[in-house]
Amino acid sequence: MDAWPRCLERLEAEFPPEDVHTWLKPLQAEDRGDSIVLYAPNAFIVDQVRERYLPRIRELLAYFAGNGEVALAVGSRPRAPEPAPAPVAATIAPQAAPIAPFAGNLDSHYTFANFVEGRSNQLGLAAAIQAAQKPGDRAHNPLLLYGSTGLGKTHLMFAAGNALRQAKPAAKVMYLRSEQFFSAMIRALQDKAMDQFKRQFQQIDALLIDDIQFFAGKDRTQEEFFHTFNALFDGRQQIILTCDRYPREVEGLEPRLKSRLAWGLSVAIDPPDFETRAAIVLAKARERGAEIPDDVAFLIAKKMRSNVRDLEGALNTLVARANFTGRSITVEFAQETLRDLLRAQQQAIGIPNIQKTVADYYGLQMKDLLSKRRTRSLARPRQVAMALAKELTEHSLPEIGDAFAGRDHTTVLHACRQIRTLMEADGKLREDWEKLIRKLSE
């Protein structure tokens, strides 16, 4: 079928070359008329495609082939019989390309049941559940989930959409990435089909858009989204959005759009703590049918601190090598397999780097951050830096104290507790913390 090569060409433009080469190019497509089957050489590739690429593949095949029903299977595409010579057909005038349809393309894999709850995401989980149970309620419409990449925002978005459709099977839930909204709008402008573009949003029950920070600087896109937002909000249709930061901090977003986004509920999704990271590793391992000892999960959770996606990447690497070599997964095997990955994590985040990042963020000189002065403008950033050192490195409290001009370990402990307590009530401090985590994880 010629739709799959066109789909693959689009995927090559959207995803890193190594991802396309590893997970997507091995796929073989078979058109069965009412569905399309993608064959993969092994179950591991099937799992990766289902988890990471299937929603986008469905959308592209629906556009290029008019068929978004996609199944994944292990094996090879059946050999087709030799076709009979085709008669010469009359020339058919080409038709204008249709606007890519916004058919429901939620990934059913992502549910509330398989979302691992922790202190960093429990408010976001509760808000997403409420949005699914009471769609359109002004208390959480729009629902905006913001935070660094790979923390579970899209999982919660999909879970809310899936829960909404489970409760109301006829519900029309539309999921888009922000660049898809932009591309479809540009295509509609080129084809003089803006009325058709706008009608797509009139009959839906919920609109889910990922990564709205990419609307920044695109004035016409923001104009269309602004009107779409107003129509959905007035019709009490649920809107769920994600962003990599608090929207008011996104330069290039129009003030009126920022104002609309603040109408409902905005919830930060923070990096997971150690316990949550360990639980995520164990949960993901169970999904893959892999036996991961607790001490291996603890090792990964201790070393991989930035986001859930990195945890999954480490787990995937571990499981793949175990499958290829036939070896059991032990702490020693994990340390050997993940050696370079773990070393890179440790080198990326150290106490000196944390101190410099915090000093730059708050506009301080390093000597002032490390000084004995206790003015509030210095004490709070210093406490933040100590708490980050405790959160992101393996250094002990005494070692952290030594790095901060020889302070006692009890001072470090107090700083960690103080910052954790303050973040529960101080939204600005929580945002500072999240930004610093993001900077240190880049």
UniProtKB/Swiss-Prot annotation:
Chain segments carrying region Domain III, AAA+ region: 105-322
Region Domain I, interacts with DnaA modulators, residue ranges: 1-75
Main location: cytoplasm
UniProt keyword list: ATP-binding, Cytoplasm, DNA replication, DNA-binding, Lipid-binding, Nucleotide-binding
Entry GO MF terms: ATP binding; ATP hydrolysis activity; DNA replication origin binding; lipid binding
Functional description taken from the UniProt entry: Plays an essential role in the initiation and regulation of chromosomal replication. ATP-DnaA binds to the origin of replication (oriC) to initiate formation of the DNA replication initiation complex once per cell cycle. Binds the DnaA box (a 9 base pair repeat at the origin) and separates the double-stranded (ds)DNA. Forms a right-handed helical filament on oriC DNA; dsDNA binds to the exterior of the filament while single-stranded (ss)DNA is stabiized in the filament's interior.
Protein name per the record: Chromosomal replication initiator protein DnaA
Annotated organism of origin: Xanthomonas oryzae pv. oryzae (strain PXO99A)
